[in-house]
């Protein structure tokens, strides 16, 4: 299969939404029956985002095969059916590490290692390898044109486009067209300068996607086309919308997909966007509203919980409920009390690392249990629910995780030293293992117990969900907690690790060690989140048993 490439770059400012624009194009092309994949090239020197602060970089998205990747890959999976893998995201750090490893091994036979050709060739090789077996590969380069970090990537995609030829490669550039209220018009000069910068490194964009708070007037589109060397029909307006799921329809109405198919000589049927139309309809026509409290410590940057936020929205669509997320800093609960949780229809405690704010999360789990408020715990959210139950119901005073208190009398959560992965291999870790890339990562099989809420929600005896953790329930103390009434409803493939717990004495109290948010999509939702939001709706209407 011959793969055609669309390289996506951004200019003027960062955070314009390259990932959303690229994913929207991918969604339309997929709706035309084409097999599409996506890639994100990140210019930073970290090998992967696994050890980066969520408040700096946003969430780390975990793929099925266990790669810790950029949050844009989450957008890709929510917009198209293709599952991302380790090959769909790589960083400058990863490329340099691989090249230096080869140099040490002697693979270059004594050559002087340089950015050109060695680094650029390594980037090109990875792009080609990551796109095999698809009709179209959309390759997004992180950062902004002009950044020094992205130059090797820009040079690599320039070379690749030359080698592939015009019939197999094209460039889409996303830029900002600001509206100046004082002048009463949009300004095209930043876009012209951005394209000029791109031309200076040998790249002529074929499509310009113009971000603005309004549609670009026809005269301004003509001006952009004239001064940026693109056809007028290739100047696409991407105005601000109240839902990112409206963007595929917005850009399709301007013929973005036709530009691609014409360029590559692809004869494909018209895009069927009926699934996206259904999503937009559900979003615009809710029958009720719920407020869900998200108790975390990275709340100053909502992107730190991007997939959880989106999964809650998807669950709202499935239940025809408008979901409002109220972020609650777990440290504030420690200082101001659980009164901060009053008036919520449900409580969600997401994943996290480190002891800052952990007692606030434990108190949130206690509040939900005692007040019969729907509770969903994810990763650390499951562990704090277990710790709270052990302390306050099972009589294990001072129970904790060894992540936060190595001297606790009741270490109900401890480091996983050994587990069996999806392929049957035994993975081992110790306290001295590196932080980066050493967690239990990726999709794992989980057995669900009969007669549990988890089994009822999923409607299946076995499921596959993605993990990202290095601490687990301590099996030595597990019987004591179960005897006190907590139900273990999900177990790992070898039935040795606890994957899900629930409280049978509570109307809806479910927690999972895995991250269900990574597999939720706007078209399909996710059973765990759908059940959680449904319970929140019942609670808000007073239908919950107290």
Swiss-Prot record:
> Gene3D superfamilies from the xrefs?
3.40.50.880, P-loop containing nucleotide triphosphate hydrolases
| Binding-site list for UTP | 14, 187-192, 223
Q: Name one GO molecular function term.
A: identical protein binding
Instruction: Detail which positions bind Mg(2+).
Output: 72, 140
Claim: Nuclease is one of the keywords in the record: no
Sites where the protein binds CTP: 14, 147-149, 187-192, 223
In terms of CDD domains, this protein maps to: CTPS_N (cd03113), GATase1_CTP_Synthase (cd01746)
Residues binding ATP are 15-20, 72, 239-241
Positions annotated as active site in the UniProt record = 379 (nucleophile), 515, 517
User: Which keywords does UniProt give here?
Assistant: ATP-binding, Glutamine amidotransferase, Ligase, Magnesium, Metal-binding, Nucleotide-binding, Pyrimidine biosynthesis
Does this entry carry the keyword Lipid metabolism? Answer: no
One cellular component term (GO) for this entry is: cytosol
From the UniProt record, list the reaction(s) this protein catalyses. UTP + L-glutamine + ATP + H2O = CTP + L-glutamate + ADP + phosphate + 2 H(+); L-glutamine + H2O = L-glutamate + NH4(+); UTP + NH4(+) + ATP = CTP + ADP + phosphate + 2 H(+)
Residues bound to L-glutamine are: 352, 380-383, 403, 470
UniProt record similarity statement = Belongs to the CTP synthase family.
What more the UniProt record tells us is:
CTPSs have evolved a hybrid strategy for distinguishing between UTP and CTP. The overlapping regions of the product feedback inhibitory and substrate sites recognize a common feature in both compounds, the triphosphate moiety. To differentiate isosteric substrate and product pyrimidine rings, an additional pocket far from the expected kinase/ligase catalytic site, specifically recognizes the cytosine and ribose portions of the product inhibitor.
As for what it does, the entry says: Catalyzes the ATP-dependent amination of UTP to CTP with either L-glutamine or ammonia as the source of nitrogen. Regulates intracellular CTP levels through interactions with the four ribonucleotide triphosphates.
Write down what this protein is called: CTP synthase
